[in-house]
Swiss-Prot record:
It is found in: Nucleus. This is Polypyrimidine tract-binding protein homolog 3. Its main location: nucleus. GO terms for molecular function: mRNA binding.
Length: 432
């Protein structure tokens, strides 16, 4: 164990955790004199008034797991005995004002274009240039104002705010760049001082230092490009090299499952070609995905998922495809396949089943009560929220556990609510 210190090192500090959250966690143990947020590392350094206060805090948290906003954080003594101004400058993020802002967008449930960002940031001054890109930190943008004061005003007003209700949270820093270079005017980069730039982009970012890819989402067809949709790399355990398109699903609840319910679940990870329930093994099914990468996503995210009281086994099949026939259901031309247009943005939302489902294409006059009544037969609804984005009604519904949410999704996706055929997917939000 590190030597006792009045400086506490806190890890796993997510972007949703604020300075006030940390202060509230440690204030019962004494006076806090300094706090440095290390946003790039998801860490923080917190200095108590004396060593005994820090010791009391760490002794308490040895037996009690500290949690902030549903996230476990981990505490230990820092190697620093005291936080100095120099150390804060080294560890803290760059705060020297500049007319260029670096914006990271967290909880990005919906695609963000330069037009959306321009609408958000232009009220604070003339935006000269704007570039978006993917990095390991997530979806980011560089926004260049005409004058520094406008950038400072935008940062003060927008830091921590959401572009859309409940998601797309802005984390804003001053960039150390002096000038943005923009080569193309399209939905990923824009030079508002030069409207005559071409729109075509040749698979490179507008500036090689900005991001790993500038390829348009509809063009993403290879593993490296798809990786960008996940924030710069594929999820742990995903190789992107699988070429087997068919998966074998076993331990199904034969009394509750059918082809359409399997389609509703597996179509979250790719386009479905065919599904076949094995009549001689009623708790088994074959699902043929659009390609090997989509099949790999399905195996990765659904293996071990609970559905209708059964824990699913999902593995690659020895069969390369499902032969068309009366005993298989064909979905190749279904308009309910989710990856036909803007496919890559859908990869970004792939995840294991969660407690939260997202409903879209809802009727404009839908109420929270109507949404809850539509799905509550599948489990205990903890919370419901109806909101509007781009003039269209959507909703989030939180269940007590992942199995209930999965049952609601497989049973109610593509059903009618108020005359509208609704779409349902898992949301990665933790709470509403």
């Amino acid at each position: 164990m590190a030597e006792s210190s009045k400086v506490v090192h806190v890890r796993n500090v997510g972007h949703e955790i604020s300075e006030n959250d940390l202060l509230q966690l440690f204030q019962p143990f004494g006076v806090i004199t300094k706090l440095v947020m290390l946003r790039a590392k998801n860490q923080a350094l917190l200095q108590m008034q004396d060593v005994s206060s820090a010791v009391s805090a760490l002794q308490f948290f040895t037996n009690v797991q500290p949690t902030i906003r549903g996230r476990n954080v981990y505490v230990q003594f820092s190697s620093h005995q005291e936080l100095t101004t120099i150390e804060q400058n080294i560890h803290g993020r760059e705060d020297e004002p500049n007319r260029i802002l670096l914006v990271t967008i967290h909880h990005m449930l919906y695609p963000i274009t330069v037009d959306v960002l321009h609408q958000v940031f232009s009220p604070y001054g003339f935006v000269e240039k704007l570039v978006t890109f993917q990095k390991s930190a997530g979806f980011q943008a560089l926004i260049q104002y005409q004058v520094q004061q406008c950038a400072a005003s935008a940062r003060t007003a927008l830091q921590g705010r959401n572009i859309y209700d409940g998601c797309c949270q802005l984390d804003i820093q001053f960039s150390n760049l002096e000038e943005l270079q923009v080569n193309y005017n399209n939905d990923r980069s824009r030079d508002y001082t030069n409207p005559n730039l071409p729109a075509e982009q040749k698979g490179r970012s507008s500036h090689p230092c900005y991001g790993d890819t500038g390829v348009a989402y509809p063009q993403m067809a290879n593993t490296s490009a798809i990786a960008a949709a996940f924030g710069g790399g594929l999820p742990p355990g995903i190789t992107g090299t699988n070429d087997r398109c068919t998966v074998l699903v076993s331990n199904l609840n034969a009394d509750s499952i059918d082809e359409d319910k399997l389609f509703n679940l597996f179509s979250l990870y790719g386009n479905i070609v065919r599904i076949k329930l094995l009549r001689n093994k009623p708790d088994h099914a074959l699902v043929q995905m659009g390609d090997g990468f989509q099949a790999e996503l399905a195996v990765h995210f659904l293996k071990g998922a609970m559905l209708f009281g059964k824990r699913l086994e999902v593995n690659f099949s020895k069969h390369p495809n499902i032969t068309p026939g009366t005993d298989s259901h064909d979905y190749v031309n279904s308009n309910l396949n989710r990856f036909n247009r803007n496919a890559a943005k859908n990869y970004r939302y792939c995840c294991s089943p969660t407690k939260m489902i997202h409903l879209s294409t809802l009727p404009q006059d839908v109420t929270e009560e109507e949404v809850m009544n539509h799905v509550q037969e599948h489990g205990a609804v903890v919370n419901t929220k109806v909101f509007e984005m781009n003039g269209k009604k959507q909703a989030l519904v939180q269940f007590e556990n992942e199995e209930e949410a999965a049952e609601a999704l497989v049973c109610k996706h593509a059903t009618s609510l108020g005359g509208s055929i609704i779409r349902i997917s898992f949301s990665q939000l933790q709470t509403i």
